[in-house]
């Protein structure tokens, strides 16, 4: 079976393991985008350490879960967000986060993958990849 969206698969795997109260999740296949998204989630304190395991194919990522995720998932289609959109959070973004202060959007910008809070500090826009709260 072909995996059409590895990022959606990774975020769903994390969410499912979190709901089952597992201490770790194994994500496969691994990619640079998934690793950068995990770094953004780790920086916000939603997940613990993670480790890339090279198995000679596409690799695996073992993520330590902390039990702090209520919901996470991909945003499809990937909406482009301008800097001004991040300040007001348009309607199609509000359906992913419960409020302006709770949770983060994960955005791919020209300076790398970061949360929407970091993008507001940097004053740049990007493309919405996923959400976590």
Swiss-Prot record:
Bilayer-spanning residue ranges: none
Cited InterPro entries: Ribosomal_uS8, Ribosomal_uS8_CS, Ribosomal_uS8_sf
Any one of the GO BP annotations: translation
Keywords associated with the record: Ribonucleoprotein, Ribosomal protein, RNA-binding, rRNA-binding
Disulfide bond annotation, renumbered to this chain: none
UniProt GO cellular component terms: ribonucleoprotein complex; ribosome
A Pfam family it matches: Ribosomal_S8
Superkingdom of origin: Archaea
A GO molecular function held by the record: structural constituent of ribosome
SUPFAM superfamilies to which the protein is assigned, alphabetical: Ribosomal protein S8 (SSF56047)
NCBIfam families recorded: PRK04034.1
Similarity comment: family membership: Belongs to the universal ribosomal protein uS8 family.
Subunit architecture: Part of the 30S ribosomal subunit.
Function: One of the primary rRNA binding proteins, it binds directly to 16S rRNA central domain where it helps coordinate assembly of the platform of the 30S subunit.
Name the UniProt record assigns to this protein: Small ribosomal subunit protein uS8
Organism of derivation: Sulfurisphaera tokodaii (strain DSM 16993 / JCM 10545 / NBRC 100140 / 7)
Gene: rps8
